[in-house]
A protein has these predicted regions:
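N-terminal ligand-binding/catalytic initiation module
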Residues: 1-39, 47, 187
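Short internal alpha-helix immediately C-terminal to a glycine-rich phosphate-binding loop
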Residues: 41-62, 70-82
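NAD(P)-binding Rossmann-fold cofactor-contacting core
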Residues: 82-106
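Short acidic low-complexity segments
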Residues: 110-125, 140-142
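Adenosine-phosphate binding glycine-rich loop
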Residues: 164-187
Length: 187
C-alpha cells in the first residue's frame, strides 16, 4: 500500500505484508514487513531490464534517476552490485533535499561524476529511470526521447500518453501496467 503523506511523518511511503507459509502444511510461520523486499525486487527487475535493453552491456555513458526515494536508492545500489559502469550519473527530484541525499548516496557507492540535474537535462541521459510517486503525467510531448534511448518507467504516471504511443514498450506485468491510470493505461 502507498501512503505518500507518510513521508511527512518520517515513515516510509509504502508498506507491504508478506506471509511465509509452511510448504508442507500451508500454515503461516512468518509475517514480514515487505517494503524492503518489494523495493529490492523492483530494483532488480529494473536493472535486469536495462541490461537486456542495452544489449547485455553493463556500460552506459550517462544514467539519470528521476525521483529520490527508496526505489531510486535500491536501483543505484543494484546497478553498482551488478558491476555497471557510467561516465556520469544525474539525479533529479522536485524535493531538493531528496535529490541531494540520493546524489550523496550515489557518491558513497563510488559512482562517478554524480550531479544534480534539471528535469530537462535528466531526460537526455542514455538510460533514464523514473521512480517517483507522481499522480499524473508531467513529461509530455512527442520527440522528448531520442531513438535508442532506454527509459525505465518504474513509476506509474510520469510519462504522457503521446510518448508511450510513439515508443517501443516492454512490460513485465501487462495487467498491472494497464490499470489505475498509469502512463500506458492512459495511452
Amino acid at each position: 500500500a502507498s501512503y505518500p503523506d507518510n513521508i511527512k511523518s518520517g515513515i516510509p511511503r509504502a508498506s507491504a505484508v508478506l506471509i511465509l507459509n509452511d510448504p508442507q502444511t500451508g500454515y503461516p510461520y512468518a509475517l514480514l514487513e515487505g517494503a524492503l523486499i518489494s523495493a529490492v525486487r523492483t530494483a532488480a527487475s529494473a536493472v535486469l531490464g536495462a541490461w537486456w535493453l542495452n544489449g547485455q552491456n553493463r556500460h552506459a555513458a550517462t544514467l539519470s534517476i528521476i525521483g529520490g526515494g527508496v526505489i531510486s536508492r535500491n536501483i543505484l545500489e543494484t546497478f553498482v552490485a551488478d558491476d555497471w559502469s557510467f561516465d556520469s550519473v544525474g539525479i533529479h527530484d522536485l524535493n531538493a533535499e531528496s535529490a541531494q541525499a540520493l546524489a550523496e548516496f550515489g557518491e558513497q557507492l563510488g559512482l562517478p561524476d554524480v550531479r544534480l540535474l534539471s528535469l530537462e537535462d535528466a531526460l537526455t541521459a542514455d538510460i533514464v529511470v523514473f521512480a517517483t510517486s507522481a499522480g499524473e503525467p508531467y513529461v509530455k510531448g512527442q520527440g522528448t526521447f531520442r531513438p535508442g534511448q532506454i527509459v525505465l518507467n518504474i513509476s506509474l504516471r510520469d510519462i504522457g500518453a503521446e510518448i508511450i504511443e510513439e515508443s517501443y514498450n516492454y512490460f513485465d506485468d501487462i495487467t498491472h501496467c494497464l490499470k489505475a491510470n498509469t502512463s500506458p493505461h492512459l495511452a
